[in-house]
């Protein structure tokens, strides 16, 4: 299964393809009180149960098929799809003389997803995580679909902002999301409108939500103020499928609001805090974010880049200042075994079968990224002692797709911190993750 949200996320603007149906598979008809229902088991559908999430998109490659389980009415107006995936990982810090990171094996994620459609125009998506002995509702929303150009979404959902954050977690190139997600919102609860215009050349999203801090999610609000989000992506050559840039997309996202509450802590790729504010610091008044972003896939290649800026007011005691954080990343990949990138995923031409000499597909990945904390946080004493102002990171790795259900990821990531971090040594992480989805 391929989905952090197991859905069809339109990453180019967050707009889904309306009324998309999974086809193929084995169907059985049964009589019901009100209508005939076809039970479809192991249907060939969109990448792992990623069939209804509305933020997948045109900056994505053609669809990949993979088994899903679904029940659908003969008319296609009603559908229930069941999916899920698990990710088990091993994390090991190399040359960790300061013992900041604990080497461990862990169940990173174990998610069950229900999604579907009712009465033709209404779609829903529920994503629950059972890992780490906790029960967490990651997403819960429903859409009212009027046309491909207009969809109304209500509930807990990903904020339409960072490209990296909008990627489905089971389809990311790397085990860890980029440093840029430290200064971008995660999930928010609110109302969003999204859709495609000009036959898919332009995709848009606009949302009003509670307004989480950088890198955080907002279950509910602690004040009356709200955040407003907007995201637009453009595919200039989308109408010409033969154009070499037909799948290129670029755009910008922005958010703004007046908020008061907790401030963010920025985490390294090893999930260790490298910047924290001094005790007693809170966010206050205005907060503005914006992010230009671009993505391109063609043949064996898939790459993307984004730059994120978060500017907000913070206060501690009698000290108040505006702090400006920025982060950027450039990521790329190449399929070594010749397969074509499909919807940010790889479908092996021949599935893993050692007796037949088949081993699946192999993909090489690389990324360089940087995060800069606002200088004012250090100049005015708002940063905690030992906090780092800069973090530079590069990662290289391999993704092994044994078949459409099983994926292995091996990453080595090195992060270097600036002199403000005192004696903090570079972080060297070797990580391995096994993923299974159905």
Question: What spans do the regions from the language model cover?
Answer:
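Outer membrane beta-barrel
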Residues: 67-260, 324-356, 361-379
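N-terminal acidic, proline/glycine-rich, low-complexity intrinsically disordered segments
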Residues: 1-7, 55-56
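Bacterial N-terminal signal peptides that target proteins for export
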Residues: 5-40
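Sec/Tat signal peptide C-region and signal peptidase I cleavage site
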Residues: 50-54
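Extreme N-terminus of proteins, especially the signal/transit-peptide cleavage junction
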Residues: 31, 59, 74-78, 424-426
